[in-house]
Amino acid sequence: MNPVIVVEGRDDTRRLREIYPDIETIETNGSAIDEETIALIQKALQTREVIVFTDPDYPGTRIRNIIQDRVPGVKHAFIEREEAVRKDNHKSL
């Protein structure tokens, strides 16, 4: 079974689906991650691998830390900040 990927927002889901059309994501909708989202992540982790894939900035790090504290057992995937800036000078991956 494929993992569930935790991302920050819709744009992240859209970008991942350009590469992996069937990928399942949980969107945190920013760094103010709510209890409903935590519950979704906890439920997903009961039956699937969960990978947190957030931006390498302060909000992304904050989200990773909150999830790690509240949902032990998730895995993390992220790019170092220096490698995250696109070549065409946009800030987002």
Regions found by a protein language model. Give the residues of each.
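Glycine-rich, flexible N-terminal cofactor/catalytic loop recognition
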Residues: 1-23
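TOPRIM fold recognition
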Residues: 18-19, 23-24, 31-93
